[in-house]
Amino acid sequence: MLQPWSEIAPRLVDVAMGRKPADLVVRNGRWVNVYSGEIVPGADIAIVGGRFAYVGPDAGHTIGEGTKIVDAAGRYLVPGLCDGHMHVESGLVTVTEFARAVIPHGTTTMFVDPHEIANVLGIAGVKLMNDEAQTLPVNIFVQVPSCVPSAPGLENAGATLSAADVREALAWPNIIGLGEMMNFPGVAANDSKMVAEIAATRAAGLTVGGHYASPDLGRAFHAYAAGGPADDHEGTTVEDAIARVRQGMRSMLRLGSAWFDVAAQVKAITERGIDPRNFVLCTDDSHSGTLVSDGHMNRVVRHAISQGLKPITAIQMATLNTAQHFGLERDLGSIAPGRRADLIVTSDLTALPIEIVFVRGRLLAEKGVLVADIPAYDYPASAKNTVKLGKRLAPTDFDICAAGSSEVEVRVIGVIENQAPTKALQRRLPVECGVVQMDRASDVCQIALVERHRATGGVINAFVSGFGYDTHCAMASTVAHDSHHMIVVGTNKADMAQAANRLQEVGGGIVLIAGGRELALVELPVAGLMSDQRAEIVAEKASRLVEAMRACGCKLNNAYMQHSLLALVVIPELRISDVGLIDVTRFESTEVIVR
């Protein structure tokens, strides 16, 4: 167990003075000092009890008979990287397997909002993930989900978190604050539940996470800032980034598997000269394939540097800035006395190869390989078998009827590649035998939201464009932010029914059916959201899914992540939920057929 600085301080002082030996000394490195913005050559670091005791020239006086010595050989000594906002569930793996995947990439601290599992299992799911996080050798702080469901009245999730639930959870150990406040209209309207949650968080001295997914930077935005959220990761333009910082919020710039928002917003620093101290890098959503093949926060830092940031600035935005934002500056986010001994050794600050990773003074990864033993975490039976459709679905469950017409104008959800927002489109579609037909030639296929929490048998149908499928196929997923019912997208209703029924059989996941044949399946038995297998195994299955989607004509980058967001009724413009088709710009339901 890591001792607080206040308890271990006498021991740190003794080591720094040379009266007692360090546990570990890293010698001959170039110290990346995120406080001064310097690269300090010829630095040694002495560590004891999982914390930095001495950082400076020649730590020979701290070396004793049992001290382990690592020669950095002139390489850079960088603070462990922090992810300022993320959802573990997006990796399709448990917290343990996510940690195993990202430690070799230099991520040593994560700030996690488990609102995905909360929408399925409620407060019990949040506690499960928080308990699991505390068993791990890295720093995983948990935020209490603020909006479950994300938009009351516009969707029904598998569970509801009340203001009382939130208040109770804020007192748990390891809780760092309130998760992203997605109900931005509620904040602007002084909704009593939102006000109560924010007040409880502030009273506890914790941080309120933000989520302002609107291009409107007028009164509603200013009201949102006045309501209390301390950060926001939903910006996509340079003006978004600047507006948030000007209002005293941290602007979180995200590079996830499907979100590429750093390039545009980092110009606030590189071109507009805005002080970088209030900018934080994060991933938000990273799937297992990205983690295994491309990295995690090291990927984000590299990308930020490629967009014009100085390496030291990009590193500050993934270490010190993040720690300061969450009130943890005196505990982590830098290589300085008293802080947790989270340390990366790298030979290149631009390419950022992660060669050695220490967390709390313990060697966890070397040369891109996890060297520590991290045991698996067993989820209880109550977290599994969560897909309850109430019946086997038939092709006719996906009919959209329009009696008495030969052609109708319909609303269509338009997918935007690499972005979370969608477009509200309209198209004219033919009607045959009273049923509206898809138009595959014009890239208009069907989408269905299948209720899967309470076995109601409910199916909401609509149209979607942007996937580019050019054959009979359907993909179904129980990862369907944020309510996590089941989303089915297809060009063929028989395949849609088969895909939905298959996921009920396996207890959740993602499946692609083409012409009655199963092309790919990713089983996600934990809440229908996560696998308890290794990230490498899940990534391989997900890779086969992507290949199958491409074989069916879909060329979108990270298409299945785009698929998973089509029910996210807090991001404009048009979404689907168990209530119906949702106009997010107006926060109200609307009809598929334009009257």
Curated annotation (Swiss-Prot):
This is Adenine deaminase 3. Its cofactor is Mn(2+). It comes from the Bacteria. One of its GO terms (biological process) is adenine catabolic process. HAMAP family: Adenine_deamin. Belongs to the metallo-dependent hydrolases superfamily. Adenine deaminase family. The gene is ade3. GO terms for molecular function: adenine deaminase activity. Its EC number is 3.5.4.2. Keywords: Hydrolase, Manganese, Plasmid. It comes from Rhizobium meliloti (strain 1021) (Ensifer meliloti). The keyword Acyltransferase does not apply. Pfam families: Adenine_deam_C (PF13382), Amidohydro_1 (PF01979). It catalyses: adenine + H2O + H(+) = hypoxanthine + NH4(+).
